[in-house]
Amino acid sequence: MGEIRSFVLITVALILGKESWVLGDENCLQEQVRLRAQVRQLETRVKQQQVVIAQLLHEKEVQFLDRGQEDSFIDLGGKRHYADCSEIYNDGFKHSGFYKIKPLQSLAEFSVYCDMSDGGGWTVIQRRSDGSENFNRGWNDYENGFGNFVQSNGEYWLGNKNINLLTMQGDYTLKIDLTDFEKNSRFAQYEKFKVGDEKSFYELNIGEYSGTAGDSLSGTFHPEVQWWASHQTMKFSTRDRDNDNYNGNCAEEEQSGWWFNRCHSANLNGVYYQGPYRAETDNGVVWYTWRGWWYSLKSVVMKIRPSDFIPNIV
């Protein structure tokens, strides 16, 4: 009888112990679920904070560049020379701004705005934004470059010499970002963009087109006008250096320097008008295949990067 009682007590103890183990396991699982939920909440908060910090850093960078001071250049410490903005991007510098670059055949560094958005690594060769710069200039100015190399939205022309030095390094893609006064945006992109040297009068060469703005540079939008509207293989002209195919002087009539033919279907260095315009002359900031000859665009950015560049799509 005593043995039976002992067996029963042992059995009851085992059953109670097993139940406590089960309860312990359930409590442990509940605690794990609770902790995991807390971790997810913390991760979400961290991501939200990271977004806020990134936005604040971007706003600070823009304010810094917009102050109009010469110290708005981003100093990389002079550790190495960069051939273009794509090399700067690949070296870990991801903020848009003014940097110093030195193409392979260049004798000296020069300043340029690097657009690290839109996949990164873009070297900006021209910008129109507000009409603050006069683009009706002579050969020397267009050859050497001019404009605002301080403010992030400043207007400038990088200079035909510098554009030649950049594009002779290899195959480059040209992307042109266009915006009208109704806040619509389009782009035109050309492969194998190249500008010749001074002996060729900085001749323009472009390859295959893609984009949403239409192909105004090659003149292929209508075969009947291509002979006079195409900018392909055109020499650069200014008011004091007439290299176009026109009997008159396109640069003088259009009040800008450009790769004129007889005269143009695109002129992104044209007269800046404070709003769209209709006039008998087509001397505005023109991209014919989007807004026609008599609409002057609000903003333009011409930027290039190596064709084999692998963009950041994050």
From Swiss-Prot:
Disulfide bonds: 85-114, 250-263
Keywords from the named record: Adaptive immunity, Coiled coil, Disulfide bond, Immunity, Secreted, Signal
Extent of the signal sequence: 1-22
Gene Ontology BP annotations: adaptive immune response; adipose tissue development; blood coagulation; cholesterol metabolic process; hepatocyte proliferation; negative regulation of T cell activation; regulation of glucose metabolic process; regulation of immune response
Any one GO cellular component localisation term in the record: collagen-containing extracellular matrix
Fibrinogen C-terminal domain boundaries: 76-308
Described function: Immune suppressive molecule that inhibits antigen-specific T-cell activation by acting as a major ligand of LAG3. Responsible for LAG3 T-cell inhibitory function. Binds LAG3 independently from MHC class II (MHC-II). Secreted by, and promotes growth of, hepatocytes.
Full protein name: Fibrinogen-like protein 1
Protein's organism: Rattus norvegicus
Taxonomic lineage of the native organism: Eukaryota, Metazoa, Chordata, Craniata, Vertebrata
Encoding gene (name): Fgl1
